[in-house]
Amino acid sequence: MAPEVLPKPQMRGLLARRLRFHMVTGFVLSLGVAALYKVGVADKRKKAYADFYRNYDAMKDFEEMRKAGIFQSVK
Amino acid sequence: MLPKAAWSLVLRKGGRGRRGMHSSEGTARGGGKTPRYTNCYAQRHYPMPEEPFCTELNAEQQALKEKEKGSWTLLTHAEKVALYRLQFNETFAEMNRRSNEWKTVMGYVFFFFGFAALVIWWQRVYMFPPKPITLTDEWKAKQLQRMLDMKVNPVQGLASRWDYEKKQWKK
């Protein structure tokens, strides 16, 4: 090999650098995933239930089911 | 059971690696040499094997080994490289080189997926018995109609996707 001089590699602080990178990344990703879950899943679900029950009429629902013939106790 | 790391150590070290650790039987062997298994060379997980790569040295190499016993600052660069090559089969860069083996492996994997698929297709045509009554299309249609009548999961699930006025799936 030709005797060219390579730059001296990083000799110290390797674990510290790795830990810092991974801790920061882990923190950011965890917060991001939690935030996305809250918005995309949890809040969406709460809204769907609220919208469903806002104008829900249980007796009307029951009558529809009864007419469809699924009950054994009432026809 | 042994943890996975221990198993890989057991499997990869080969005969020589394990026995070479404890015994003087290696050095006492003298004339005969145990055959070198391919996985006795240095690997990333086994970087310092007991035996050097070259054990039979010619006169020049013997002289170099004698010089190595003195101060290392007296060795030239070429001599240091020669000593490294005597001790080790490959440098770290050579040992860790990439290969195209993964393409071969994936090829075989997909080939056998396809082969298995053909075998199962043949079985479906010639061997399978008729479906149970609950898996026939008529039964499944009646089952779905009953689920919609019962309004199964009306908030976010099945019945929420059905338009009860128009009697069709919501767009």
UniProtKB/Swiss-Prot annotation, chain A:
Pfam families the record matches: COX6C
Protein's membrane topology: Single-pass membrane protein
Family in the record: Belongs to the cytochrome c oxidase subunit 6c family.
Membrane-spanning residues: 14-54
Record-level GO BP terms: oxidative phosphorylation
Keywords attached to this entry: Membrane, Mitochondrion, Mitochondrion inner membrane, Transmembrane, Transmembrane helix
Organism: Macaca silenus
InterPro entries: Cytochrome_c_oxidase_VIc, Cytochrome_c_oxidase_VIc/VIIs, Cytochrome_c_oxidase_VIc_sf
The protein's assembly and partners: Component of the cytochrome c oxidase (complex IV, CIV), a multisubunit enzyme composed of 14 subunits. The complex is composed of a catalytic core of 3 subunits MT-CO1, MT-CO2 and MT-CO3, encoded in the mitochondrial DNA, and 11 supernumerary subunits COX4I, COX5A, COX5B, COX6A, COX6B, COX6C, COX7A, COX7B, COX7C, COX8 and NDUFA4, which are encoded in the nuclear genome.
A GO CC term attached to the entry: mitochondrial inner membrane
SUPFAM superfamilies, per the entry: Mitochondrial cytochrome c oxidase subunit VIc
Protein name: Cytochrome c oxidase subunit 6C
Topological region Mitochondrial matrix: 1-13
Location relative to the cell: Mitochondrion inner membrane
Role according to the record: Component of the cytochrome c oxidase, the last enzyme in the mitochondrial electron transport chain which drives oxidative phosphorylation. The respiratory chain contains 3 multisubunit complexes succinate dehydrogenase (complex II, CII), ubiquinol-cytochrome c oxidoreductase (cytochrome b-c1 complex, complex III, CIII) and cytochrome c oxidase (complex IV, CIV), that cooperate to transfer electrons derived from NADH and succinate to molecular oxygen, creating an electrochemical gradient over the inner membrane that drives transmembrane transport and the ATP synthase.
Mitochondrial intermembrane side: 55-75
Pathway note: Energy metabolism; oxidative phosphorylation
PANTHER family, per database record: CYTOCHROME C OXIDASE SUBUNIT 6C (PTHR48416:SF1)
